[in-house]
Each structure stands twice: as C-alpha cells, then as structure tokens.
C-alpha cells in the first residue's frame, strides 16, 4: 500500500511526458516505445549505495564500485552500435538534504550525462534507483512521499529545458 502514492505519481508523470512527446513528435505512445528500440543499462555508476564509505562528491559515488565515469564518447559508440535508449539509474540519497533538496553539483553531473545521451540522439530513461530499497529514504513513510514528489519536481524543472526524448520512471 505504501507504494500506491509513488506509483500514481509515476503514472501521471509518464502520461504527461508521453503527451508532450506526442505534441513535439506527432508520434503515439506505441510509436515512441517502438522507436526506443534496443536499450543499454548505464548501471553501477550513479546508483551506488549502502556502503560504509561516506560519499562527498559526485565522482566518489560514480567510481565507488570500481567503474570509470561515463563520457560523451561512450554514448556516441553505443549509438553507432545500434542502441537507441539509455536507462540511467540514479541514487539520489547521498546528495539530498533532509528536506529533499538535491545538491546542485550532483544535479549538474546528472544533467551533463543526460545531455550527452540526448546529443547522441538517444532516448534517456531516468530511473530513481535504490532510494526505494528497504531502509532507504523512500521507506520512511508519509514524509518520504513529500520528498519523493519534491525530487521529481526538481528533476522535471531541471530537464524541462532540454526535454526532447526523456521518459522518467521509478523502479519499485
């Protein structure tokens, strides 16, 4: 039952984004999904969590599990290799204050990667990831609903300026 509210927000956001994509592309939701084609998961970079180390900078989180940070060339290579969609899982909890405000350095780093994906003419699926796992901030009850809504407001406000092919969802 605790996931009902976030799920309703997700459905509403997805519906609004698909409506927006239809307006700018004149494609139906089915056509957009079909156009997304083969996807690539950009995992184990921005979604690290549950560590004993304190994470202070975006680069510390991105490299925490031993991976190299992504770069623009990666997305150009993936596009040339036939991928059309990038799933971009992001864990926000290390870069949010108690009210849910996202650290501007983290949002800037996320935005940089999204821009590279869009510049490569690919779809980008932003996935609020690991924040909803057991014992993380999205399991804190009613207070987490407001933080969750505030997080998506920040994401939407940040990316509305560059929104051409972005679809947002939460993995529950």
Tell where the protein language model's regions lie, with residue ranges:
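Structural recognition of the beta-strand scaffold that forms the well-ordered cores
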Residues: 37-42, 85-89, 124-127, 168-171
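Feature marks short, highly hydrophobic, charge-poor N-terminal signal-anchor/signal peptide-like helices
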Residues: 2-6
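Aromatic-lined carbohydrate-binding/catalytic grooves of carbohydrate-active enzymes
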Residues: 83-104
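Short Asp/Glu-rich motifs
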Residues: 97-98, 135-137
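N-terminal carbohydrate-binding accessory modules
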Residues: 19-85
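An active-site-proximal structural segment forming one wall of the substrate-binding cleft
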Residues: 66-83, 102-128, 138-169
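Active-site-proximal loop/turn and secondary-structure-junction residues that shape catalytic pockets
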Residues: 92-94, 130-134
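Single-pass alpha-helical transmembrane signal-anchor segments in small membrane proteins across taxa
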Residues: 8, 12-16
